Regions:
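Alpha-helical transmembrane segments and their helix-membrane boundary motifs
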Residues: 1-30
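Amphipathic, heptad-repeat alpha-helical coiled-coil "signal-transmission/dimerization" linkers
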Residues: 26, 30-33, 37-40, 44, ...
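Conserved nucleotide-binding and Mg2+-coordinating catalytic segments in signaling enzymes
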Residues: 55-74, 95-108, 117
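Short regulatory alpha-helical coupling segments
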Residues: 55-56, 69-89, 120-128, 147
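Cell-envelope/extracellular polymer assembly enzymes that use nucleotide-activated donors
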Residues: 91, 184
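Short catalytic/binding micro-motifs of nucleotide second-messenger systems
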Residues: 125-131, 163-177, 211-213
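A short pre-motif secondary-structure segment
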Residues: 133-136
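Catalytic-core segments of nucleotide cyclases and related cyclic-nucleotide turnover enzymes
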Residues: 147, 151-162, 176, 190-240
């Protein structure tokens, strides 16, 4: 009888020990699982952050932090198709910093880069609607895409852009006619036809044509393009 009780006690003790071992094993497994899940969550967050960073770098100009040239073209094509579908106007504004080469020669490239950064921030402040885009088009040239904006509306915004850049009060090069950095600004507008492809109406060519005319006239002015490029750009505005 004593042997049976002893065996039972030993068995109970073994079962208790086994239960404790199972509990501790499960506890360790639970803790380890929680650690793995937390590590996976952190890794997923890091990967998503890296993906967003890569996406931003692929669409953003590294100097000015506005959209780059490729993103501008993609955005313009997308907005062109939307405007064609909805029968709405679409406008472009091109901006060129006046006498920028002379500025770089006098003050150095680092100072020139700082001017471009400030101009980029200025443009982003003036054009703040979610459906619009500010991009660096080429060197000292910027481009703005204005969705659902007609000719008079884009011209008004273009004048705001010209004035805002002048009001930055950035010192100009000695050979520039102005004391402060100014910009030549040009606009073009179209209402895409339903039967047309986006390439058929070259808003870029029209706006850049007007931009060349604005530069040739001395800068610090806004011109609105003739979309057919017949005759000179119209609505010249000059501020001296």
């Amino acid at each position: 009888m004593e042997i049976e009780w002893g065996f039972a006690a030993a068995l109970i003790g073994a079962l208790s020990t086994f239960s404790v071992w199972v509990y501790l094993s499960r506890r360790r497994l639970y803790v380890r699982t929680a650690e793995i899940e937390k590590a996976l969550e952190l890794r997923t967050t890091e990967l998503e952050s890296a993906r967003l960073q890569l996406q931003r770098l692929s669409t953003e100009d590294p100097l000015t932090a506005v959209a780059n040239h490729e993103q501008f073209l993609e955005f313009l094509e997308r907005e062109w198709r939307r405007a064609r579908r909805d029968g709405l106007p679409l406008s472009l504004i091109f901006v060129d910093v006046d006498h920028f080469r002379a500025f770089n020669r006098q003050f150095g490239r680092k100072a020139g880069d700082e001017v471009l950064k400030q101009v980029g921030r200025c443009l982003a402040t003036v054009v703040g609607r979610p459906g619009d885009l500010v991009a660096r088009y080429h060197r000292d040239e910027f481009a703005l895409v204005l969705a659902s904006t007609d000719g008079p509306g884009s011209f008004k915004i273009a004048e705001q852009v010209r004035s805002a850049i002048r009001d930055l009060n950035l010192p100009a090069a000695k050979e520039a006619p102005q004391d402060f950095v100014t910009a030549s600004v040009a606009t073009s507008t179209a209402v895409p036809q339903r039967e047309s492809a986006w390439e058929e109406l070259d808003l870029i060519k029209a706006a850049r044509h007007a931009l060349r005319e604005a530069r040739a006239a001395g800068g610090n002015r806004v011109l609105r393009a003739n979309l057919g490029l017949v005759g000179p750009p119209e609505l010249v505005v000059t501020r001296r």
